[in-house]
């Protein structure tokens, strides 16, 4: 039952914040309650209100493009052409599309643009079960190559993602490294899902492949040669070890890793900005990291 709840939570990605409740139930030694109403969850209500009340800012414009059949969303500041870009990979357990996630990732894309001064490209990558691995990875790589084709320098690109998108960001960089392709300037992950290797139930994204393939589960990857990484996680989330393990491996491989665990926080709590003070603190950290990465480029 607990494992099933994990998949439900991941599938809803940043839209459902019940991880904190789930972890508290597991830590107490008991199973989750049978009665489990997402609508009654305070964090869900806050996020729904934030998304409903949000108005796209006048100083930015949205452009939806299609690259080889894959939809992507550009967020750019009007009358400004930045040579820096953030490639955002959304969460949702590899089963929820960008459209399924509603306004959440458009809000986050604008937030990335505001704090960085960069343009932001969000990929509506194909999702399981119709499109298992390697579909999402192929689409992330397609977007990255498109940025290079448009003239963006690798050192001017940051790949960012949350939950499944965080794992996908790491998998994308693992692929780039293994194939001697240009690496981005940095990677940012929020509550990344890095280990899909479950004994009892196989995630839909795995398909007929091995779940311990590093391109599916970056938990098993080798991180030597990676760019600087900022990894954030909530202290009370089920996926905490998905961050801690990868951060440790990367640090041992000589990678510059800035890892922050926010006590008492849940899965992808950052999406509750500006309502939640911890979310605002996390975004301030992201801003400082991006400023540092782009400062000499």
Q: PLM ranges: what are they?
A:
Residues 1-15:
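N-terminal Sec-pathway targeting helices
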Residues 18, 23-41, 48-297:
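Alpha/beta-hydrolase superfamily serine-hydrolase fold, recognizing
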